[in-house]
Amino acid sequence: VHLSDGEKNAISTAWGKVNAADIGAEALGRLLVVYPWTQRFFDSFGDLSSASAVMGNAKVKAHGKKVIDSFSNGLKHLDNLKGTFASLSELHCDKLHVDPENFKLLGNMIVIVMAHHLGKDFTPEAQAAFQKVVAGVANALAHKYH
């Protein structure tokens, strides 16, 4: 992903103001609520029968933290997202058979949750930069599908 210095600064500033684990848990939870067909990949997570069940589910929160930790690592390697996410792309493609469109949906959830948590501090410039990043991450995760 090519980002200007201003975009990199906007990402760093915004990311520095949030609790990553909270962002991950809420983003994954929202994905499972808003796009319920994504729940099929999480059969072992127990009760996902309602929005409150999903958002309060400890396994959703734990996996959301794993997801956002990987995303956070990607923020440190913006010039090599395909390499950074190669093993996760292979896992999600070959073993889990996740539809790569879901990566785009999750990226959008991350942006929505960032906006929710940061309010006015999530400027249009920061959003534009994050949209580039989540698109780049989704593309990197879908790489093994091509």
UniProtKB/Swiss-Prot annotation:
Keywords for this protein: Acetylation, Heme, Iron, Metal-binding, Oxygen transport, Phosphoprotein, S-nitrosylation, Transport
Tissue expression from the record: Red blood cells.
Keyword Acetylation tagged: yes
CDD domains: Hb-beta-like
Keyword Transferase: no
SUPFAM superfamilies linked: Globin-like
MF (Gene Ontology): haptoglobin binding; heme binding; hemoglobin alpha binding; metal ion binding; organic acid binding; oxygen binding; oxygen carrier activity; peroxidase activity
Residues modified to N6-acetyllysine: 59, 82, 144
A Gene Ontology cellular-component term: blood microparticle
PROSITE patterns per UniProt: GLOBIN
Positions of post-translational S-nitrosocysteine modification: 93
Domain (Globin) ranges: 2-146
Binding positions for heme b per the UniProt entry: 63, 92
Pfam families for the chain: Globin (PF00042)
PTM-bearing positions, type Phosphoserine: 44
Modification N-acetylvaline occurs at: 1
InterPro entries from the UniProt entry: Globin, Globin-like_sf, Globin/Proto, Hemoglobin_b, Hemoglobin_oxygen_transport
UniProt similarity note: Belongs to the globin family.
Complex and partners: Heterotetramer of two alpha chains and two beta chains.
Protein name stated in the entry: Hemoglobin subunit beta
Gene: HBB
